[in-house]
Amino acid sequence: MLYNLLLPHIHNSHIANLFHYITFRSALAIIITLSLSFITGPILIEFLRSLQKNGQPIRSDGPESHQTKVGTPTMGGIMIILSSCLSTLLLADLTNKYIWITLFGFISFGIIGFMDDYAKVTKDNHYGVRGKSKLLLQGIISFIICVLLEYLDKSPSHLLNVPFFKNLSLDLGYCYIVFAIFVIVGSSNAVNLTDGLDGLATVPIAFTAGSFALISYLVGNLIYSNYLQLTYIPNTGELTVLCAGLVGSCLGFLWFNAQPAEVFMGDTGSLSLGGVLGIISVITKHEIVLAIVGGLFVIETASVILQVYYFKATKGKRIFKMAPLHHHFEKHGWAESKVVIRFWIISVIFALIGLSSLKLR
């Protein structure tokens, strides 16, 4: 909004000219989202606590230390969604189609998560909306997004770029749409599975969003994309502002979500954040890089899949003491803070590996 209002005055005002730069608007997005989180956080937490008598239901079969979390309100993802969307609407170019498509997906996945959180709180159990129902809704939203991208792009690309290899890409044809839906839905649920400890998912999400802020900027810049031999996709640079807003929102939320958490992001936050990261990776054609940068989410998801299939195949035996993987280490006696910080370190390593793929070819 501010960008569009100041655009006619860019050449006449030094201050207005600053808004011409994506980097300036991205930095401002981080500041705004952080400030909004600090200001609205206590108000939202108190409001959620007044509505939720028992807070988020805690699994009885989980680590014993989790029983101390009883009464902690959920749906804190509302704080992340509102601050991110507001900063994007203020600072991004509102004539950019990718901004609106991404915001549509972000909010839609947030609504699905809100429905799930609401069901958990009102029924006072941790099951919420049925898994198949959530997958169906996620699939429908992802399909709509893919159709919009196909329709709005004059020459939609169905190429899957392979990182670390020069000029290597796979033409998936219209199967790419199915693949893109899988990426978006998979990313949404992977982040959701990782969000099981205080602050655990928040920092890796911030690292991933920060990585894609850089990727969006490079892919949307003709000079940099040619130099790095990346697929040039015009107008994706504006997604840098949105990604920066996500970073600021997550850091602001971490202020209240650090152990012991005052609020949980819930599925409202995890499904929406995972979904928006998947959408951005599809738009920028860096789907595989998302799996690398967000490697922690992949590992957590793989641990659940392996646990379920092994349990069924062996009729009751388990690979891990408990899945997702972070609970396995808790069951081994690791303190929650140790699990969280070590997983943060792992996420930093994955982010660096993913970003190195931009140059190493």
Swiss-Prot record:
It is an enzyme of class 2 (transferase). Keywords: Cell cycle, Cell division, Cell inner membrane, Cell membrane, Cell shape, Cell wall biogenesis/degradation, Magnesium, Membrane, Metal-binding, Peptidoglycan synthesis, Transferase, Transmembrane, Transmembrane helix. Its main location: membrane. Pathway: Cell wall biogenesis; peptidoglycan biosynthesis. It is a multi-pass membrane protein. The chain crosses the membrane at residues 28-48, 74-94, 99-119, 133-153, 168-188, 203-223, 236-256, 263-283, 288-308, 338-358. It is found in: Cell inner membrane. It catalyses: UDP-N-acetyl-alpha-D-muramoyl-L-alanyl-gamma-D-glutamyl-meso-2,6-diaminopimeloyl-D-alanyl-D-alanine + di-trans,octa-cis-undecaprenyl phosphate = di-trans,octa-cis-undecaprenyl diphospho-N-acetyl-alpha-D-muramoyl-L-alanyl-D-glutamyl-meso-2,6-diaminopimeloyl-D-alanyl-D-alanine + UMP. GO terms for cellular component: plasma membrane. CDD domains: GT_MraY. One of its GO terms (biological process) is cell wall organization. PROSITE patterns: MRAY_1 (PS01347), MRAY_2 (PS01348). Its cofactor is Mg(2+). PANTHER family: PHOSPHO-N-ACETYLMURAMOYL-PENTAPEPTIDE-TRANSFERASE, PHOSPHO-N-ACETYLMURAMOYL-PENTAPEPTIDE-TRANSFERASE HOMOLOG. Belongs to the glycosyltransferase 4 family. MraY subfamily. Catalyzes the initial step of the lipid cycle reactions in the biosynthesis of the cell wall peptidoglycan: transfers peptidoglycan precursor phospho-MurNAc-pentapeptide from UDP-MurNAc-pentapeptide onto the lipid carrier undecaprenyl phosphate, yielding undecaprenyl-pyrophosphoryl-MurNAc-pentapeptide, known as lipid I. This is Phospho-N-acetylmuramoyl-pentapeptide-transferase. It comes from Rickettsia conorii (strain ATCC VR-613 / Malish 7). The gene is mraY.
